[in-house]
């Protein structure tokens, strides 16, 4: 019937009396915190930053010191390795050259003792002398130099005294004869020279000299 009143179910704008109330949405609290500087006194913040800066400076100095130590250790290691390699090289060179020197001695003895007379012997002698000269030139190129010892004061760092004898020509402790040639290698002793050393004129010569002086005075 058109005259009937509308019921709540028929009118959507009217809420039913038994309807459950709608819960209100909870208020969301902000999780954002204010900036740290807004809660800290500027003087305290400055002090904190200065402390952090000082700590960083100390750490930097420590790392710098460690770096310098490591760099110095590495440099010393490199120099030590270089010296060791040079020492090994010098030892090998000295060992090799020391084995060659007796060959040079034999050439020099042959040169002094042999006196070839025939043309064939002279040709052979010249051939040997050519080899000797080449050998000496090679030694010079390697830094080997002969010692000059006769007339020099005896020096145990350079000479090895094999004989001692009286001499009226040279004073005591002066080298009067070279028995085996000595050599230097780049300024260092490669082989000591074997020498004969003067003992001076001796007591008999001194007595004769004193007697002669007395005779002249009388």
UniProtKB/Swiss-Prot annotation:
Organism: Parasynechococcus marenigrum (strain WH8102)
Biased composition (Polar residues): 1-10
Domain of life: Bacteria
Disordered: region residues: 1-44, 198-218
Residue stretches of biased makeup (Low complexity): 200-218
Cellular-component GO terms for this entry: cytoplasm
CDD domains: GrpE
Pfam families in UniProt: GrpE
Protein's recorded name: Protein GrpE
Compartments, record wording: Cytoplasm
SUPFAM superfamilies named in the record: Coiled-coil domain of nucleotide exchange factor GrpE, Head domain of nucleotide exchange factor GrpE
HAMAP family listed in its UniProt record: GrpE
